[in-house]
A protein has these predicted regions:
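Short, solvent-exposed polar/charged micro-motifs at secondary-structure junctions
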Residues: 37-41, 65-68, 127-129, 155
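Hydrophobic structural packing positions in well-ordered secondary structure
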Residues: 1-2, 68, 220
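Conserved beta-strand core positions
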Residues: 53, 64-66, 173
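Accessory alpha-helical/coil subdomains and C-terminal extensions
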Residues: 1-62, 77-78
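Glycine-/small-residue-rich active-site loops that bind phosphorylated ligands and cofactors
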Residues: 9, 73, 123
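Short alpha-helical segments enriched in small residues
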Residues: 76-235
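A generic structural signal for beta-strand entry/edge sites
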Residues: 26, 61-65, 183-187
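Short beta-strand-to-loop capping motifs
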Residues: 31-33, 66-73
């Protein structure tokens, strides 16, 4: 997996770019898991297909804010240009506004009034701290937190550890992060489980240690959000 260095941008300046043009349509998307180059390639293709299409991006550790403006030349109940944009990024879109992963996760847990426990090894507590930094009330839905070194060398070991943690905490859902730092990167492994199923995820990140941890954190949060959104999630 190739990971690109994030660009630096000022969110306030990006918002100002598209102001005071009432004849245009504006939208914002948050996407996860695509490289900066891939995102730009997709946006350039859209620019060739949609009238007056302009964009700005803010890319940071696998998460990208995309700000778009375009012109609908034909009035219609269905915004075909918006459909083209959404189709281009498909399952990578996790928000059509400024909501972060942490805010979405809090909203899903609070709406369902369900509990979560988080066991962090390789991410060193960054998942829990990010969740609580944005939503102090999330503490009401966290049953247990562990920040402790351990090693599961195989998927089977991680499944066993996950099921035990789920049983011990009595939570509706658990998240466990694991992995191993290697030369120039991180082999990241994590699990998400409810009472009916366990999902194991594996990723390889190439970057310095701190950046790898940030990407691992974002990856775990993204897949946790997807799991909580699933209609068949066993609540």
């Amino acid at each position: 997996m190739i990971v690109f260095v994030p660009i630096e941008a000022d969110l306030y300046i990006l918002n100002k770019v598209f102001e005071n043009q009432p004849d245009l349509t504006y939208c914002q998307y948050k996407v996860f898991g695509l490289s900066k180059n891939t995102i730009i390639e997709k946006l350039e293709l859209l620019k060739n297909d949609i009238p007056y299409f302009e964009y700005k991006i803010l890319y940071d550790n696998l998460i990208c804010d995309i700000f778009i403006s375009y012109k609908n030349e034909e009035l219609s109940l269905i915004d075909e240009n918006k459909m083209k944009i959404v189709s281009a990024f498909n399952n990578n879109i996790f928000s059509e506004n400024s909501f972060s992963l942490c805010k979405i996760i809090y909203s899903l847990l609070s709406q369902k009034n369900k509990s979560i426990s988080i066991y962090e090894n390789i991410t060193k507590g960054k998942i829990v701290s990010s969740l609580l930094d944005e939503n102090e009330n999330l503490i009401n839905y966290i049953k247990d937190v562990k920040i402790k070194s351990f090693q599961c060398d195989s998927d089977d070991e991680l499944v066993e550890t996950t099921l035990k943690y789920l049983k011990d905490t009595g939570s509706d859902v658990v998240l466990i992060t694991n992995g191993k730092f290697v030369e120039n990167g991180l082999n990241f492994k994590f699990s998400i489980a409810d009472k009916n199923e366990v999902h194991i995820f594996n990723s390889n990140f190439k970057a310095d240690k701190n950046k790898c941890i940030e990407m691992a954190k974002n990856s775990a949060l993204f897949h946790l959000m997807k799991k909580l959104r699933q209609n068949n999630f066993a609540f």
